[in-house]
Structure formats: C-alpha cells, structure tokens
Amino acid sequence: MYKVVIADDEVLIRMYIREILENNGFEIVGEAEDGLDAITVCKQKHPDFVIMDVNMPVMTGLEAARVIHEDKLAGFVMILTAYRDKEIADQAVDMDVMGYIVKPVDEDTLMPAVKIALNNYRHQEEMKREFSRTREALDDRKYLDRAKGMIMDQKQLSEQDAYAYLRHLSMDKGISMTELAK
C-alpha cells in the first residue's frame, strides 16, 4: 500500500482527494494546509508520494516540492493547480515533479495521473538501481584490471595467466576476486 501526503489549503479538496485515494487502496499518512506543513509532514512520515496544490499560504507548493525533492523526503511530488499556466508547468518540470493535475479534480482524472506517475517513478528507480549496479561492476573491473596489470609486471605473466593467478589466489583465500584486487 502506497503512503501519501496531501497538501492543499482547502480542506474540502483534501477530504475529496483523500476519499478518492483511500477508495483506490492508498494510505493517507498526513495532510498539510501549506507548503511548510507539507515539508514537516514529509519529514515525519516519509511518504511514497505527495499530491500538493501550487497556491498555498506560507510557502507555495512549488517551493515545497523543491525542498521535498532535494532532501528526498518523499518518492515524488504531483502538483495540483487551478491554473493552466505554462510557467508553472515549466517550473514543475525543472523540479522533477511527476504529475501536473488541473482542478477541478475527480477520480477519472486523478487516478490515471497517479498510476502513470507511480509507473514512471518505478521505472526511474529501477534505472537508478541498474546504473548503480553498472557503475559498481565497472569499478570492480577497474580494480581487477589494475591488479592483473601489477601481477603481469611483477611475475612476467601474460594477461590470461595473470587472470588465472588472481582467480586461483581468490579461491585459496576464500574471497572474491574483486576483494582480492582491492
């Protein structure tokens, strides 16, 4: 079950969005009436995502979205606005907002936007994990190549023989070749 924070200065809108999301299996872990409260709730609850109005008192939704994104206080943010404004949309894109929903909102517009945002977020997170694994494998390969080169120089071995030597030594020591190379 996904954990959600709803931030809107209008209590009736928060209640309506809560009802829609809860009826679709989401858990509302917090509500906020301004951007600053949204940040505070996110720090406490660490939601999967936030649905936040743009125009709120104290701190706007866009300002709060920037803090939430930069401080990794939630998986992602979706913006809710009464305005079809290119400038707001451009700012939302710059802050990696995952969804832009124009009021009035109803279940038929909210739920597809939420599902698409969740799907895009999952794909983005998987790409980050894959990138991290690839970077780690590349780093491991660099260590192995460096160790292999040192063995080739010190023992006057071919590349293939140096690799076999590393493999044999790692098996004797009971550690991975990467650990040995480091």
Go through each PLM region and give its residues.
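Receiver (REC) domain active-site loop signature in two-component systems and cognate sites
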Residues: M56
